[in-house]
Amino acid sequence: MSKLPFLSRAAFARITTPIARGLLRVGLTPDVVTILGTTASVAGALTLFPMGKLFAGACVVWFFVLFDMLDGAMARERGGGTRFGAVLDATCDRISDGAVFCGLLWWIAFHMRDRPLVIATLICLVTSQVISYIKARAEASGLRGDGGFIERPERLIIVLTGAGVSDFPFVPWPPALSVGMWLLAVASVITCVQRLHTVWTSPGAIDRMAIPGKGDR
């Protein structure tokens, strides 16, 4: 979860726990909720953002991102999740994040025609995946790879706020998208460096590895 107090697990638990119990009673599983939330989030991002409906797209994506958090609450109510569920949730998060940046990239590239902003968006798209991969690959090797400025909640807050404010009804501020995207791009690159440094300083990180055989590749 985020380091921000108002995005803490405890803060959301007050809202999500009763809803999670209700969903479990009607027979839904955490994995089904994960897939439904991701599907809706991706559909909203890839439909509304390319049409230039940035405020509506930001609201839809944010709603279903919050909806997707119900799967964790449901798993806790059932006494714990499964390893497959954890992998599915992480995979769907990457798909959802990718859809957000791809939808915005389409609008920026083909309608705004802002080349510098295209570059910033591409940086955000790539680093959003790399940040998560560094942690996953490090933990698979028994090392630490967490921390850094930007985690998923902060990433979504920055990009969705920038998109929404740039197209806000009645009082839009168009530069907000560019400001948010460049801020996120810089912070994301720094986070990649921070996480790599965390991996490098982990115990055993520079120990030599056995050379894999042909059958291991």
UniProtKB/Swiss-Prot annotation:
Name of the molecule in the record: Phosphatidylinositol phosphate synthase
Record's cofactor remark: Contains a di-nuclear catalytic Mg(2+) center.
Function, as annotated: Catalyzes the conjugation of the 1'-hydroxyl group of D-myo-inositol-3-phosphate (also named L-myo-inositol-1-phosphate) with a lipid tail of cytidine diphosphate diacylglycerol (CDP-DAG), forming phosphatidylinositol phosphate (PIP) and CMP. PIP is a precursor of phosphatidylinositol (PI) which is an essential lipid for mycobacteria required for formation of their cell wall.
Example GO molecular function: CDP-diacylglycerol-inositol 3-phosphatidyltransferase activity
Residues annotated to bind a CDP-1,2-diacyl-sn-glycerol: D31, V32, V33, T34, G72, R76, T82
Residues annotated as catalytic: D93 (proton acceptor)
BP-aspect Gene Ontology terms: glycerophospholipid biosynthetic process; phospholipid biosynthetic process
GO cellular component, one term: peptidoglycan-based cell wall
Catalytically driven reaction(s): a CDP-1,2-diacyl-sn-glycerol + 1D-myo-inositol 3-phosphate = a 1,2-diacyl-sn-glycero-3-phospho-(1D-myo-inositol-3-phosphate) + CMP + H(+); 1,2-di-(9Z-octadecenoyl)-sn-glycero-3-cytidine-5'-diphosphate + 1D-myo-inositol 3-phosphate = 1,2-di-(9Z-octadecenoyl)-sn-glycero-3-phospho-(1D-myo-inositol-3-phosphate) + CMP + H(+)
Amino-acid positions noted as binding Mg(2+) 1 in the UniProt annotation, renumbered to this chain: D68, D71, D89
Quaternary context: Homodimer.
Pathway: Phospholipid metabolism; phosphatidylinositol phosphate biosynthesis
TM segment ranges: 30-48, 54-77, 83-110, 115-140, 152-166, 176-200
Cellular compartment(s): Cell membrane
Organism: Mycobacterium tuberculosis (strain ATCC 25618 / H37Rv)
Chain coiled-coil ranges: none
One Pfam family cited in the UniProt record for this chain: CDP-OH_P_transf
EC number(s) recorded for this UniProt protein: 2.7.8.-
